[in-house]
Amino acid sequence: MSTHNEYDYIIIGAGSAGNVLATRLTEDADVSVLLLEAGGPDYRLDFRTQMPAALAFPLQGKRYNWAYKTDPEPFMNNRRMDCGRGKGLGGSSLINGMCYIRGNAMDYDNWASMPGLEDWTYLDCLPYFRKAETRDIGPNDYHGGEGPLRVTTPKAGNNELFAAMVEAGVQAGYPRTDDLNGYQQEGFGPMDRTVTPKGRRSSTARGYLDLAKPRPNLTIVTHALTDRILFSGKRAVGVQWLHNDQPQRATARREVLLCGGAIASPQILQRSGVGPADLLRSLDIDLVHHLPGVGANLQDHLEMYLQYECKKPVSLAPALKLYNQPAIGAEWLFLGTGIGASNQFEAGGFIRSDTEFDWPNLQYHFLPVAINYNGSNPIKAHSFQMHVGSMRSPSRGRIHVRSKDPREHPSILFNYMSHDQDWREFRAAIRITREIFAQPALAPYSGREISPGSALQTDAQIDAFVREHAETAYHPSCSNKMGHADDPMAVVDGQGRVHGLEGLRIVDASIMPQVVTGNLNAPTIMIAEKLADVIRGRTPLARSTAPYYKANGAPVRKQG
């Protein structure tokens, strides 16, 4: 394996953030970058990662998925729950559901209200969302037209259930929005997806890394499992990794950029001697710097599926039958169209379940077939389902390494559903969803409630169902939170620099101080775009002046 020993920057993790940094930093021809990825290439001929409709497949094996498990979750019947994370060029953008959702404007204004994060307002972040994006129907004040990330919008003629579901949400009294990433997130409407015009997954490997790979100043090493960051005193000076179980080293002249994501980044820091001193001493890890927030503040989104039989034969159930799949695959492969070219999450919404919330606290994804996210337990009959979950749970978890061995998975505990608010939100979510499915727009379609089943009505029954059946939405975050140095639990400052150390930044979803209202791929890419300008010493993009919606205490729904 040929790698030089010295680079300006070493990036750990070729995922949603790392590939953005690698691409932007190597635009400066005099800068050398080493990009380390524990997984393999993103094989372009592997339909499992490239076909949007095949999104369940990468979660089923371990080629593309770290397949972490939580410790027994105490409020979830002590279940050890899935915590899938992407492995390979593209990271989790190689295996995610491809929903292009940025979060609510108020999420970022909320971040910016925290000491030290003043330049993370929505209007500061919006130019970087736009910079990353090329939207298929063209740019506007909210969307970009020249970015590496391809975004596809739902089109007329898609499955009729999508429009019916949006209409039902409006009939139930909730707002309609024509763009969940535009002026107003709150309401029901079409959902954009990170898919190319030719119907392929638009991961950061395809969008960004394809631009950077030909550059002589970028070196990419796959199957490189990071062991630890190397320090000289309080300065990060390099990285040690394993390649075929053999230790390799490189040094960084300027900075080490940690982009491992919300599970891997705290692990790597802790193994490197940065984290809670008591934990590190108990594992005989030499302490470089005591930072109690490393691995703390862990957050995620939890979600439920509500599944219904479909009275009309218009769902995607036939696509699950093996004898129909060759034709679907051929149309996608040769034409880039058809069922295979969509992730099938083409409608959804964000609502407030109660006026106690200043911005939406529930997210909906609608799917015109009933099946688990990982492809298990498909319903054979015509059916559809709604995914619903709370967005800003007060529950907080933690990540602890178990040993110095980089091959050993960490101890992960989210403490899902550990607050009363969690239970109130999930009870409301299930009851509101049933109301939506009872509206006239869905009356021609909505049949028997398959799951949870109409017999479950009381709080106790709903709570028991949630404990047994709620699953992760695969949005782990916030485990190395941004904040002012005066906050003892903050790990990095507003520019991603690790407190108390030099030459080390974290750039990924772990630095979010609070999880955003929506999916995490688009915000993670934005964070990397924004911090790439900081690292390069460039003037930040001018703040946007686009207007955006605030509920300001408005009723959560219109009464009929």
Curated annotation (Swiss-Prot):
It catalyses: choline + A = betaine aldehyde + AH2; betaine aldehyde + NAD(+) + H2O = glycine betaine + NADH + 2 H(+). It comes from the Bacteria. One of its GO terms (biological process) is glycine betaine biosynthetic process from choline. Keywords: FAD, Flavoprotein, NAD, Oxidoreductase. GO terms for cellular component: membrane. Its cofactor is FAD. PROSITE patterns: GMC_OXRED_1, GMC_OXRED_2. GO terms for molecular function: betaine-aldehyde dehydrogenase (NAD+) activity; choline dehydrogenase activity; flavin adenine dinucleotide binding. FAD binds at residues 8-37. The active site is at H475 (proton acceptor). InterPro entries: BetA, FAD/NAD-bd_sf, GMC_OxRdtase, GMC_OxRdtase_N, GMC_OxRtase_C. Belongs to the GMC oxidoreductase family. This is Oxygen-dependent choline dehydrogenase. The gene is betA.
